[in-house]
Design a protein with these regions (language model features):
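Short helix-capping/linker segments at secondary-structure and domain boundaries
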Residues: 29-36, 69
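Short, structured motif recognition centered on aromatic/hydrophobic residues
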Residues: 17-26, 55-59
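Mid-chain, well-packed structural core segment of small domains
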Residues: 33-49
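Generic helix-packing signal
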Residues: 28-29, 46, 60
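Acidic, glycine/proline-rich low-complexity segments that act as flexible tails and inter-domain linkers
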Residues: 1-15, 40, 44, 67-85
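Helix N-cap / loop-to-helix initiation motif
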Residues: 14, 48-51
Length: 85
């Protein structure tokens, strides 16, 4: 249902925007394995490394610096390799 129904409604919200929202929600909860998976998906949806770093920096003030700092190594790992889901 999630990927078949919700993610397919691109006329309501783009895949890129859905990726940003999902990464933000997962980061706020500290769900780092899922963050990494969605960083890979976000990269495929044309999110840049700079945008992800800015999202993490913004969220650091709302969900805590430790959560943001835990995401930065994942961003480097995903954006410095050719990961695919």
């Amino acid at each position: 249902m999630l990927f078949g129904d919700v993610w397919s409604r691109e006329n309501k919200l783009s895949l890129r925007d859905r990726s940003m929202i999902t990464i933000s929600a997962l980061m706020a909860q500290g769900l780092y394995p899922q963050v990494k998976a969605h960083l890979i998906i976000g990269k495929e949806h044309v999110l840049t490394k700079e945008e992800i770093v800015e999202i993490a920096t913004q969220l650091a003030f709302y969900c805590g610096w430790p959560k943001a700092w835990s995401v930065f190594p994942l961003v480097d790992e995903v954006y410095n390799t050719d990961n695919k889901i």
